[in-house]
Amino acid sequence: MPSNNENLTLPEDKKKRKKSENLYIGTPPSNPTKSPFDDFRTSFEFKTEGQTLRIVADDLTTICELGRGAFGVVEKVHHPETNTTMAVKRITPTQDSIKTESLLMDLRTLERSDCPFIVRFYGVMFRQGDVMICMEVMDISLDKFYKCVFSANRLMSEDVLWTISFSVLNALAYLNKELRVIHRDVKPSNMLIGRNGKVKLCDFGISGILRPGSVAHTVDAGCRYYMAPERIDPTTNKRYDQKSDTWSFGISMIEISTGSFPYERHLKDLFKQQKQILHQDAPSLPDDGRFSLTYRQFVQRALKKKVEDRPKPYQLLEDTFLKEQRHCESNIVRFVNDILDNTSAD
């Protein structure tokens, strides 16, 4: 379920905090006497309905595990005193500077964010050696949700696909234009959906700061299956910008729309992975009657192989598909609840 406390808000000072275009995410200082996490406490405060509430790490009760990855575990927790349910990303800091950078990047992006299409940040704590990033809890990731849909012999209707597209592109546009950030790991598992029909983007651990007029170079950040051609093409010197997120979005939408990943998954053969992306035609939605022409063209625009022909996320928001469908009635709330209820019953 979404957070039991729907009126949670960030502290006023965080809402008013000026956005920084000069944030530097670098290797933490080597001074062994000072850790980047030394200033974290075992509690934090947030404002809701005019009251300031305090969350203490020891008071949290774990409900279940929501996910697990290379950088830690995400748990659904409950705070009895405030009757608040949250998602907590629990990470054990190491001497690995890359993992430390990832954790700090995730934290700083969430702290600076004030976007309805990005998971809300409540606070951060340090307990028993673990950093605990407390966030809004959603019901399910889209990689799991679309599998539930197709397992039930249902289809993803275009009003649902519209909501997903509109939400994710708005999140990416906000990151790009307001925070100067490239997400770099856009995929269905980092898109979350709730019973209220809201779709939000999460996981900014490998996001990259993009200064005005600059391009990024790191190729190792993100899942290779969703990477844009320019991110893995050796002839481009691995230079890329916000348009690489657009490509990853397009690949994700084909997967969510059809229930199948558009490329063959060669789990151990890196060369075959790259060959598919670089030398095959860009994937496209099937012309089999399931999808409208405007939606198929919308996804096709996101998957232009030539980066100069591909729009940035904010530019793709102006597409005909999103404009035409904007005022159409959506059944996404009923659809999501129906799928999740039937899945729970199974």
Model-derived features with residue positions:
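Conserved short submotifs of the Hanks-type protein kinase catalytic core
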Residues: 129-141
